[in-house]
Amino acid sequence: MDTRRTRSTRWAGAAVAAGALGVALVIPAGQVGAATGDTYQVRNLVSDVPGVAQVTDPHLVNAWGVSFSGASPLWVSDNEKDVATLYAGGVHGGTQTINPLVVNIPGGAPTGQVSNPTTSFVVHGSDGSSAPARFLFVGESGHLSGWAPTVPPPPPSTQAQDAVVTPGAVDKGLALGMTDNGPMLYVADFSAGTVDVYNGLFQRVITAGNFQDRKLPDGFAPFNVAVLGGKVYVTYAKQDADRVDEVAGAGMGRLDVFSLDGRLLDRAAGHGQLNAPWGLAIAPAGFGAFSGDLLVGNFGDGRIHAFDPSTLVPTGVVSGEDGRPVTIDGLWALQPGNGTEGGTDEVLFTAGPQDESHGLLGSLSLSD
């Protein structure tokens, strides 16, 4: 069954990403934490729609998860095209380029992805070739796959390889953590409402805490997962009746933090501003008052909220140069730049604007 997203979940008031900035509903005073006074500039770098961004790439449709490998180009999961594409440039608005490599993702509909710096997570080609995956992917079809440049030869390969297929799973997020028992993959299965853990042999592992939150409202499920600073951050959204897509709305989101073995450490007390949250990143140095804060991007209304990463206390909302909250239609990933794609003081974002029928890669930086 194709579990690819089929409907819009955004409020009608969300701005189209082609405009980059927009105004959504006003959040009551005190709900988002202290105002910072800093404002941020949004740049559109790549889109599938001509004229929207610096460059046009027809593969970039419903741009979702992202990852880097050291100083590599940025890898982006193109959910509606069943591929991953690579980008470099765009540093502080500089020249943006498209890498010619396009990687096919088995099962299609890719969502989360991670780079793998370890020698674990070996993938195998039908020709007998094998190597550790350099990048790993999950998708709404329940496929966990990996790409290695030599599998199959000749390099660079244009095909990721299946590692685990879970019938009925609708995987929305993927993270990699380094534990005392070796590297582990964390997969957010939105349909089952679980965070599934796999070791370096792609074997399922039951953790001590098993990522349980007994105070989570009924019908909320893991929407994304990220390992940041040695902790596992999990965002939750409300499931629709089919347990495939999220239900958007003010307060329709939760945020928890766990240990690497799945023990609940804390919950975000202020979740009224969360609206189907998916994007997770620690803001880099040079990102103004939010430097070092946990950034949480709402898919539901396109806003980006900041939290103290230690206490999960809200610290504010990212605002544009007009002083109003930045609103990015169909916002998915948040990722600090690495100097190859985006500056090291910038935050990259992906989005699936206009009901996920288009794609956008852009950047956020402190206003000049």
Task: Label each PLM-derived region with a short phrase.
Residues 2-33:
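Secretory targeting and sorting signals
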Residues 30-368:
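Sequence/structural signature of beta-propeller domains
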